[in-house]
UniProtKB/Swiss-Prot annotation:
Belongs to the metallophosphoesterase superfamily. The keyword Metal-binding applies. GO terms for cellular component: outer membrane-bounded periplasmic space. Residues 258-291 form a coiled coil. InterPro entries: 5'-Nucleotdase_C (IPR008334), 5'-Nucleotdase_C_sf (IPR036907), 5_nucleotidase/apyrase (IPR006179), Metallo-depent_PP-like (IPR029052), Pesterase_YunD (IPR011240). It comes from Bacillus subtilis (strain 168). A divalent metal cation 1 binds at residues 12, 14, 48. A divalent metal cation 2 binds at residues 48, 81, 179, 202. One of its GO terms (molecular function) is metal ion binding. This is Uncharacterized metallophosphoesterase YunD. One of its GO terms (biological process) is nucleotide catabolic process.
């Protein structure tokens, strides 16, 4: 007998709550439709639901996000890197204490080799027709960062293979909730064809009709709640097999309904968060300014805080990381979150004088200062002018109309080509293609769990 099963999935919401009332309304409507047709519906979130750029998430350390998932009555969730590495250890350990759904992640452990109390390596769901589905889950293994936060994360592919051996005889269908990114998910599909469907995330791909790799269906719904994905599986309950599987997405911009209850809940959470973040951390005698394309007070203050916190020779901060000024008077946690919402940590690296000079020259180029940045934890608009503490950078605009770095000195002396210098930077400089010499530095020390705004609060309070 042929029957239909639907898996609705969200991924990488990043606390863009403006779309959540639509998502709730859409899924609730679809549940009712399928229920009236006698068809089963399951709902999953594939991680990075939370993002501390949003002040409600900041104030609750993500517990408001879990409340939203509870209220939607989802059937399971994976965790993303925003859940995994942007929360202090004790906050992640307690994040899902009140979750009313299984949190499925097989490759995360504490330092004693135990899973978090809320984690399961897989979840088996029995369907009304007698068939069963095994749901597996993995998260992207940022090894040094998890280690710094007191966790152990293991190789995702090996973990999947181990879990497959456990569930193979227990389930008719195998679905992987993966927060690895599309390239890794394609590799998983090639290596583990026993998987029927991968609900994927992390790299924010929109797979409007899914993608089939080695017989495995990959499905992903982009980011920020712009879309909700749906995998439709037609099964033969007598043969206990899959007849067909397809993927589609619903654009939330085209969905007009909204959940009034969800909007009211979010409004209440915003009021609570504003009150919780209203504590003053410092008092300013006068306004503190920021200018993205010239040296200004707040980025410089952060540069000095970074150098002092990391105990380095030098620090470098892009002015665009500060999103606005601070007014004279009390400075609250909410004020600092408003001007520096990024989930970005300090990092200390070691560079030779030659590498440092090349990096500074690169940062001073108009192309870098004007660069629009997306991702890497950055929640602003533009890179902006690089400012420094501990090193003096002299520049001059020459006849070619380009600003050139003419001299770099440390304590009045030219930096030495082969000497090693410790440099405090933003962790986003160690990722991607922004600063290859920083990214490829052999020595890196991450300072966690503090974010840049925590360093600003510490420095302002001095």
């Amino acid at each position: 007998m042929k029957e239909k099963l639907r898996l609705y999935h969200t991924n990488d919401l990043h606390s863009h709550f403006e779309n959540w009332p639509k998502i709730v309304d859409y899924i609730e409507q679809k549940r009712k439709e399928h229920q009236s047709d006698g068809e089963e519906t399951l709902v999953f979130d594939i991680g990075d639901h939370l993002d501390r750029f949003q002040f409600v998430t900041e104030a609750t350390f993500g517990k408001a996000n879990v409340d939203l998932l509870n209220r939607l009555h989802i059937d399971g969730a994976a965790i993303g890197n925003n859940e995994g590495i942007t929360l202090p250890h004790e906050e992640l350990a307690a994040l899902y204490d009140h979750a009313e759904f299984p949190v499925i992640v097989s490759n995360l452990f504490d330092k004693n080799g135990n899973r978090p109390s809320w984690a399961v390596p897989y979840h088996i769901k029995s369907l009304k027709n007698g068939m069963s589905i095994a749901f597996l889950g993995v998260t992207v293994p940022y090894y040094p960062v998890y280690d710094k936060l007191g966790w152990t994360v293991t190789d995702a592919l090996e973990s999947i293979k181990e879990t497959i051996l456990e569930v193979k005889g227990q389930a008719d269908i195998i679905v992987l909730l993966s927060h690895l990114g599309i390239l890794d998910d394609q590799a998983v599909a090639e290596a583990v064809p026993e998987i029927d469907v991968i609900l994927e995330s992390h790299t924010h791909h929109l797979l409007e009709d899914g993608q089939v790799v080695n017989g495995v269906l990959l499905a992903s719904a982009e980011k920020y709640g712009h879309y909700v994905g749906c995998v439709e599986i037609t099964v033969d309950s007598v043969q206990r097999s899959i007849n067909s599987k397809t993927a589609s997405v619903q654009n939330m911009a085209e969905w007009t309904g909204e959940s009034a209850e969800t909007k009211a809940f979010l409004n209440e959470k915003e009021r609570e968060a504003e009150e919780k973040l209203s504590d003053a951390v410092a008092e300013l005698a006068q306004d503190a300014e920021v200018k993205w394309f010239e040296e200004s007070e707040l980025p410089l203050l952060l540069a000095y805080a970074l150098k002092e916190w990391c105990e380095t020779d030098i620090s470098m901060v892009n002015s665009g990381v500060i999103l606005g000024p601070l007014k004279a008077g009390p400075v609250t946690k909410l004020d600092l979150h408003r001007i520096c919402p990024h989930p970005i940590n300090p990092v200390a690296v070691r560079l030779t004088g030659e590498e440092l000079k090349e990096t500074i020259v690169h940062a001073a180029s108009e192309q870098m200062e004007q660069l629009r940045i997306k991702g890497l934890g950055f929640r602003g608009e533009v890179m902006g002018k690089m400012v420094y503490a501990g090193v003096e950078v002299e520049t001059k605009r020459l006849d070619d109309g380009i600003t050139h770095v003419t001299r770099i000195t440390l304590n009045g002396e030219d930096i030495e080509k082969h000497k090693q210098y410790s440099v405090a930077v933003l962790d986003m400089f160690t990722l991607g293609k922004l600063f290859p010499l920083i990214r490829d530095a052999a020595e890196k020390e991450y300072f966690m769990p503090e974010f840049l705004r925590d360093l600003l609060a510490w420095k302002l309070a001095q």
